[in-house]
Design a protein with these regions (language model features):
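Catalytic NTP-binding/metal-coordinating core of nucleotidyl cyclase/transferase enzymes
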Residues: 1-73, 77-78, 196, 202
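Catalytic beta-strand-to-alpha-helix segment of the class III nucleotidyl cyclase homology domain
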Residues: 59-169
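Juxtacatalytic C-terminal regulatory tail of Ser/Thr protein kinases
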Residues: 169-189
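Acidic, proline/glycine-rich low-complexity intrinsically disordered segments
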Residues: 183-202
Length: 202
């Protein structure tokens, strides 16, 4: 079994189940289109590797935390551009979590705390948002144009100690893109809602 340090991006499409209920024929086709025209090309540009898909989500391994962050931002911006003039059934809105940590590889399977932390950060993000662990912020705070806003320690599922999460703020791809507002959520997510309204300003 191989073990190494990697940057892991976890992403999930917001509202996929509702879209499936509304149109179970068009929704999978739309997701495949988004995968082939947005997700796969951006991940390839930033040298990532999708190692798991979950129907409406995916996990990506990057060798570089900078590549992982830039890839995540690029996907969110491309998705925002895609969503212009689209009805809700065709929009692609993602939540994302990003972490750097040890991973273990068993064949094509990738697991470990490096993966788990990214996966548990993702549901806490606002729609269209990116949350990163302190490991990412420590590496990149002075190396990127993106800004990091601390949300303080977060108690993640199955983690022995809290993880400090940071909200990523980046410049818009161009003016006038759609803004999304987070869903109603429990106290932890209300903290994110107050601070994440203009995340990536899309």
């Amino acid at each position: 079994m191989e073990r190494r340090l990697a940057a892991i991006l976890a992403a999930d499409m917001v509202g996929f189940s509702r879209q499936m209920q509304d149109d179970e024929v068009r929704t999978p086709s739309n997701l495949r289109h988004i995968q082939s025209t947005i997700i796969d090309p951006e991940i390839a540009v930033w040298r990532g590797r999708i190692f798991k898909t979950t129907g409406d989500g995916f996990l990506v391994e990057f060798a570089s935390p900078m590549d992982a962050l830039e890839g995540a931002i690029a996907i969110q911006k491309a998705a925002a551009a895609h969503n212009e003039n689209k009805d809700s059934g065709e929009q692609a809105v993602f939540r994302m979590g990003l972490n750097i940590g040890d991973i273990m590889l068993d064949g094509d399977d990738v697991f470990g705390d490096g993966v788990n932390i990214a996966a548990h950060l993702e549901p806490l993000a606002s729609p269209g948002g990116i949350l990163v662990a302190d490991t990412v912020q420590d590496q990149l705070w002075n190396k990127t144009d993106a800004a990091f806003e601390s949300l303080g320690p977060q108690n993640l599922k199955n983690m022995d100690a809290p993880i400090v999460a940071y909200l990523v703020r980046a410049e818009p791809v161009r003016p006038g893109l759609v803004s999304w507002h987070p869903r109603t959520c429990p106290p932890l997510r209300r903290t994110l809602r107050r601070s994440a309204g203009d995340l990536i300003r899309i």
